[in-house]
């Protein structure tokens, strides 16, 4: 054989079998950065049609987690695929930099503002901390192979962005959407200040649990709802609460509209009365109340009770029944005492019904001087007094002490309260914001489409948006309020622009340093500066204006796509929609895509305590970013995204299949010059024409899947092509022709031309997903080309190929099926040691007339398709009794070991081996390929 080895066209490539991605990728990143790849891409798409994906900013605190990776990789795949489609798709990454988590981190280091450090110094420390966090996260995102303008990201703490956030608020105000109101917040009476969620800890606490009766104002109206006409005894609706001190602020009774409520008669201590209770809780309630006897009088849906009125148990006013989604039957009575000034759920439902937000409690936890009966008492100490008064009024049905989980201040470890405080709101209804936002939702494409109904329900039900916070590190609400009337300064909008100009130069500290007289002159004494800061959701929600509208890369274009996790319907998608609609009367986006959360192999959330966290840094350091990227692309993001070491291992296996396909392609176009060696499609061998046609059809499917953001379909179709059409069929068949044909023959160049065309197309197909691997392949492809695949567009060399009428797509599909059946028979023969390899086999195909006609089309070249040394097509009717059945009714098979000599060069067993005296170990085909014109192939 050694004599003939040099006559073979053996595959050769510098593209290694092993990706070694973890080591090789950082080198590529360095090269991309040094060569300004992102700017090269921008330059290549200058003046092209824009596609704007606006980056929802992650919070600048802590390391990135797997969810961050999913998000950034999905965005990157879209940006790259849109770029390949010819769009100018800049990507400006952003970070959310203000807010409580950063304050808490800085507090741990330097203490609270106003103690060891001034508020100004504290803000500077927050700015420095956020900048450091951004640097760490940026490095991790870059490592994922995400292309972006990493040197010029947007930060919500950039001076110009802070200024633009203020300008955005001025437009919202100018449009008439701002109003001042009150809202309950966590309040520590020891701190004398509001607490954020992160500052609240839950500890066990003993509290009084009481059942309280509210008597009916209009008995006949209530009875009518239950289908009754008269009843001689008192009727009450009963609430259960563990915070008796909030009863002075009661303004309603909440029931669940969809629950059944029962009017139950109870006799206790000789007294008869009827009570309204949730049907499911009647038995537990009457037992708790110590009833001697009870009977059900009637039932009705909670929704029927809406707006009936009941008397407050100790004040001289009555309150309505309202419907609340927060009402459950887990405990209590199924009726919830509602004090909008002392609870978030109460406040939200109270907003819907326009209830007064009563706040009888001062900063120090003591009832204010105008609080009837309880003025001057501390709320927790007043519990006993409230209970005693209820008993005196005959309204107390039960009283016990319970131990339950209760919010405490994380600093003082003392119980806290919910307390209404003055806040700034964007109104949902005073200028029609809710109606307009719902209209805009309909005009937006939501992917998946259930996102539309989800955000619609949220907008329909959401209360006014409280945009103010009492924090130090945040964009200030730059308003001047009249000291007596609490009215905004009449020139607020123009004053805000002047403040914004200062912030643009000096950052948000400019507001706190500002002397009101500098802007207001003599009016300064009549006005006070607002010291509240904006909710950080306002910061990020206004970036369509504060960032997109001001960055030159976006050139004034509107945003095409927002893409975030499914929690952002309530978060960034919502805040952006509200602000944009309030400012401009329209949504800030045309499409909104959401992806699910990452969960482990058992469907559990990632949690350090469970120990199931998969850090993206660990994956890139061990397997490489391309493996992580392939997992993201291959996973259907519309639901939960499952990830585990086992799943990533499967991604690595899939990656190897793609890599091995690419390696085969590169190895077999080694030495091929597309300028001089390309065979025109019409002159190609039929099988080569077919595979180019399949690649062209696949490209259409892939481009459609990319365009519709169906990346899991991209990977599925690509894997199918690599594994089935190429791996199991085409590449297997062409090895003989590729290796043994005369090196410059049409038979071989036809094959190489097809491989080259597929390579040019495939490197582009995979570039948005397997970016590192695509770059590696690109550099090894023959022919003149640009430096990077990422500046290219989809390959246009896969022109439509017309197949011979006899050799249609259906013909080749049929051949694939026949070959699969033949392979089963050959594999079985190998297992039973009947033959060594497929080339030792001679195959008889007993086929019906239609199949026989099709197979005979290929003549002697059928053996190359079936990878056997000899094939005979025989009529099905002549099949012997021992012929092997197949899955096809039209085909039976026979196999025997060839008795012919084996050709030393091509390994086929042929009768003509040794017919040429000078080459006694070769078949005549190999002799022709070595010394003659070279064999002619027409079909395969």
From Swiss-Prot:
One of its GO terms (cellular component) is cytosol. Binds 1 zinc ion per subunit. Signal peptide: none annotated. ATP binds at residue 608. Its cofactor is Zn(2+). Gene3D superfamilies: 1.10.730.20, HUPs. Its main location: cytoplasm. A motif ('KMSKS' region) lies at residues 605-609. It catalyses: tRNA(Ile) + L-isoleucine + ATP = L-isoleucyl-tRNA(Ile) + AMP + diphosphate. L-isoleucyl-5'-AMP binds at residue 564. IleRS has two distinct active sites: one for aminoacylation and one for editing. The misactivated valine is translocated from the active site to the editing site, which sterically excludes the correctly activated isoleucine. The single editing site contains two valyl binding pockets, one specific for each substrate (Val-AMP or Val-tRNA(Ile)). The keyword Zinc applies. This is Isoleucine--tRNA ligase. Catalyzes the attachment of isoleucine to tRNA(Ile). As IleRS can inadvertently accommodate and process structurally similar amino acids such as valine, to avoid such errors it has two additional distinct tRNA(Ile)-dependent editing activities. One activity is designated as 'pretransfer' editing and involves the hydrolysis of activated Val-AMP. The other activity is designated 'posttransfer' editing and involves deacylation of mischarged Val-tRNA(Ile). A motif ('HIGH' region) lies at residues 58-68. HAMAP family: Ile_tRNA_synth_type1. Zn(2+) binds at residues 903, 906, 923, 926. It comes from the Bacteria. Its EC number is 6.1.1.5. GO terms for molecular function: aminoacyl-tRNA deacylase activity; ATP binding; isoleucine-tRNA ligase activity; tRNA binding; zinc ion binding. The keyword Ligase applies. The gene is ileS. It is found in: Cytoplasm. Keywords: Aminoacyl-tRNA synthetase, ATP-binding, Cytoplasm, Ligase, Metal-binding, Nucleotide-binding, Protein biosynthesis, Zinc.
